[in-house]
Amino acid sequence: MESIIALFQGMGIMHITLGQVIMIIVSLILLWLAIARRFEPLLLLPIGFGGLLSNIPEAGLAMTALDHLLHYAHTEQLTIIAEKVNSSSLDVHTIKQAIAFAPPSVQNELEVIASDLGYNAGILALFYKVAIGYGVAPLIIFMGVGAMTDFGPLLANPRTLLLGAAAQFGIFTTVLGALGLNWLGIIDFSLPQAAAIGIIGGADGPTAIYLASKLAPELLGAIAVAAYSYMALVPLIQPPIMKALTTEQERKIRMVQLRTVSAREKIVFPIVLLLLVALLLPDAAPLLGMFCFGNLMRASGVVERLNETAQNALINIVTIFLGLSVGAKLVADKFLQPQTLGILLLGIVAFAIGTASGVIMAKIMNAFSKHKINPLIGSAGVSAVPMAARVSNKIGLEADKQNFLLMHAMGPNVAGVISSAIAAGIMLKYISTMI
């Protein structure tokens, strides 16, 4: 009889909390968006499934060895942990707060102690540690994106680099917005958290995940979900802003035919770009370095096997682990916070400002330029490649059925990828000197 009672007590459903129920529903919504609505399915599907796995009661798939120790809360073991973090209380919540403020070296020591006491990390926690904790997955994905990117439109019309840079204005205004919410006492955001949220405005998922893992890992789940959800909604978010900021006549502007870019230019550009940016801003070197390496494999034409692997098999494999790793952060105690609502609101504001900034910059450039730029391509400065460029082309065709803007829009679109990586480097450098 006792064994039957123990069996029932060991059932996950006997331990499920309201927070876990809510997060399971959120995860199911993400799966529905990925499968039924085709919203960024390559990321939202593994993220949603990872969220399901993370919230299964008593499974502990997303828990580290230390999390498991605190969950079972044996008094003698809690005493050891409390001494290490100088906590006079054996209350688990108090100890968790002390651990959160402990230096990384102490946190690592506590993980080792938990492992020595016989606790093991769950599979999703291991995925997270390697894929995101060490920054491996976002960087490999950036390499794959580089292998898929053609710098030709940007090199053929270099001034579109300004449009990509202007679209990053949404990042920095959103940082100020997050700090403003903190100053007003509405939602608490630290400077590193504000910077991690702001990068959502770059519409670049890997960059957002990379920066969040460095500056605000506790917000990574919400930031990743917001970034990829809004990237999927680009065709809905951008058109109203583009139409509101342009006239019918401006949308009909036809741009001059792009020149042919030589193979030599395409080979030299990623090397020069990396050297110029990395020597001035070393913190941008990891992201930009992998991006330029991937692009050099494509442009050189001598490593087709590597190029093919980077932009297909490798990026697909890493995307699976990245999505599951992000899902590991969709646990109730981390996701169901007032900050999550603030992140979702600030994220869409960042997208809107980035879109508007690119369009406005194009209009400003037209005031001083002989060869006019169609302002619609300015919205492609956000680095949702190639979705933002397709939206620019679609709105242009609505105004003039013979006005094809896709290749012109790819210039600022690629520039946006470069600019978001540079913006992330600036954030890392600036904040590392502040804290």
From Swiss-Prot:
Disulfide-bonded cysteines: none
Subcellular location as annotated: Cell membrane
Membrane topology: Multi-pass membrane protein
GO MF entries: decarboxylation-driven active transmembrane transporter activity; lyase activity
Domain of life: Bacteria
Pfam families, sorted: OAD_beta
Coiled coil location: none
Stretches that traverse the bilayer: 13-35, 42-64, 123-145, 165-187, 215-237, 267-289, 309-328, 340-362, 404-426
Keywords attached to this entry: Cell membrane, Ion transport, Membrane, Sodium, Sodium transport, Translocase, Transmembrane, Transmembrane helix, Transport
First-listed, main subcellular location of the protein, grouped into a coarse class: membrane
Gene Ontology terms describing biological process: sodium ion transport
Cofactor (UniProt): Na(+)
Enzyme class: translocase
GO cellular component, one term: plasma membrane
EC number: 7.2.4.2
InterPro entries: OadB_MmdB (IPR005661)
Catalytic activity, reaction form: oxaloacetate + 2 Na(+)(in) + H(+) = pyruvate + 2 Na(+)(out) + CO2
Family recorded in the similarity comment: Belongs to the GcdB/MmdB/OadB family.
NCBIfam families the UniProt entry points to: Na_pump_decarbB (TIGR01109)
Function: Catalyzes the decarboxylation of oxaloacetate coupled to Na(+) translocation.
Oligomeric form and interacting partners: Heterotrimer of an alpha, a beta and a gamma subunit.
Name of the protein: Oxaloacetate decarboxylase beta chain
The organism of origin for this protein: Haemophilus ducreyi (strain 35000HP / ATCC 700724)
